[in-house]
A protein has these predicted regions:
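Conserved MFS/SLC helix-loop-helix module at the cytosolic interface between two early adjacent transmembrane helices
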Residues: 74-112
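Helix-loop-helix hairpin linking two adjacent transmembrane segments in secondary transporters
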Residues: 152-197
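Cytoplasmic helix-loop-helix junction between adjacent transmembrane helices
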Residues: 118-157
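Paired small-residue
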Residues: 102, 113-121, 317-325
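C-terminal transmembrane helical hairpin of 12-TM major facilitator-type secondary transporters
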Residues: 292-337
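Juxtamembrane intracellular "pre-TM" segments in multi-pass secondary transporters
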Residues: 10-19, 200-232
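Helix-to-loop junctions at the C-terminal end of transmembrane segments
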Residues: 76-87, 277-290, 375
């Protein structure tokens, strides 16, 4: 598929290469994205506490995670695309304040119904903020550094996702699960001022589409862009595998013979940071034309991870190795996917990221729901078998949809 991005005539001249985005701004995008996405994942190491507090069975408590993913899906369809027709800076401010309110509401929930409604709102607004920031970063970056900037911001997302479990586990042991969401609300207020002061004015101006026309155009993008279709399905399968692991991990580790605290269980998220940091250059590799090779290696890492993960009952070191492989593969594939889709339609970054992440939300929700039910009936080995099958499907799908190798062109 042809890209709508035209290469500037001066690209080959290093002296005339456009100035890059300041490192401080790249870091702000990464930190803010990480804090926003963490809100969606705080519940994962708290499932046993939530089940006990609200009288929800282990087989059904995965519905708490699914509620956040339903919120994610609604955000991706209804809120994230607004960045293409509204002032992104003002949109960020309104969504951030609404997210703070949703976090406070979760901390005060007194029934399972109120909890699920609050989790849906957190998923809705946390996702809108996160993906809005990713699209913002892509639009603010020059074409020659888009992969690097998106990769850095997405690394912040991935690390925030992983550290959410550490944060939630530690705060829960100190102040209960309700304290986790109160602290999260305070963190969002703390990042509000730096975001408002530093977010740049995007080079692209908001479009003139009506909201109805905007939503309709998303369907057209989904039907027309093969890159989006292929990378979306890969994201669905990859995030299903990712959530199959992380949503189930708390259940065996909190039970005998381990009996780990929430802090100890959440600390396993720190191990995942190693894999995420190792994959941080995936966006740069995509900029250099190695997107398909990176995808293949990432998917193989995702599949191989399930072997050591299945040995957790005999060795926690095997669990550590498996987490590194799983997060390495997931992060590298995710960054590569986004780098590729952002190159298709520069004027539609918010809609593209919304559609792409809709696949992610569906995969995450299905993975969370399937893994808790699988664990209740088949234990940890059943979870690992499920993850292996989903990861293998992702690798096979990439193989049958990969583009043909380019033919060699003789140099003059």
């Amino acid at each position: 598929m042809k890209s709508n991005l035209s290469l500037p005539s001066y690209q080959g001249d290093a002296l005339l290469k456009p100035a890059g985005m300041p490192s401080s701004l790249v870091w702000l995008f990464a930190v803010a994205s990480g804090l926003c996405v963490a809100n969606v994942y705080y519940a994962q190491p708290l499932l046993d506490a939530l089940a006990l507090d609200f009288g929800i069975s282990y087989a059904a408590v995965g519905g708490v995670i699914t509620a956040t993913q339903v919120g994610c899906a609604l955000a991706l369809l209804l809120l994230v695309p607004l960045g293409d027709i509204m002032n992104r800076r003002h949109l960020m401010g309104m969504q951030l304040l609404a997210l703070v309110s949703a976090l406070v509401a979760v901390s005060m929930a007194q029934s399972a119904t109120a909890l699920l409604a609050g989790m849906l709102a957190v998923g809705l607004l946390g996702t809108a903020m996160t993906q809005g920031l990713i699209a913002y970063a892509a639009s603010a970056a020059a074409p020659h550094e888009q992969g690097r900037v998106v990769g850095a911001a997405q690394s912040g997302v991935f690390i925030g996702l992983l550290l959410a479990r550490v944060f939630a586990g530690g705060i829960s042991d100190l102040a209960g699960w309700r304290g986790v969401y109160l602290c999260a609300a305070m963190l969002m207020l703390a990042i509000a001022l730096p975001l408002w002061r530093r977010l740049p004015t995007p080079a692209t101006t908001p479009g003139s589409l009506s909201y109805t026309g905007l939503i309709h155009s998303m369907l057209m993008l989904l039907l027309q862009e093969k890159t989006l279709q292929v990378r979306g399905v890969l994201a669905l399968l990859m995030f299903a595998a990712f959530n199959i692991f992380w949503s189930a991990l708390v259940l065996p580790l909190s039970a005998p013979p381990y009996g780990f605290s929430h802090t100890a269980i959440g600390a396993f998220g720190l191990v995942g940071v190693i894999g995420a940091l190792a994959a941080a250059r995936a966006g740069t590799w995509a900029d250099r034309g190695y997107a398909e090779r990176t995808s293949a290696l990432a998917l193989m890492s995702l599949l191989l991870a399930w072997l050591p993960l299945s040995l957790m009952e005999w060795s926690l070191w095997a669990l550590v190795i498996g987490i590194v492989l799983l997060d390495l593969g997931g992060q590298a594939l995710h960054v590569t996917n986004q780098s590729m889709i952002f190159r298709t339609r520069p004027e539609a970054h918010s809609r593209l990221v919304g559609l792409y992440m809709l696949f992610y939300a569906i995969g995450s929700g299905l993975g969370a729901l399937a893994t808790t039910a699988t664990y209740a009936h088949a234990g940890w080995q059943g979870v690992c078998l499920l993850g292996t099958v989903v990861s293998l499907l992702a690798l096979l799908f990439w193989w049958v949809t990969r583009p043909p190798l380019p033919t060699a062109v003789a140099r003059p």
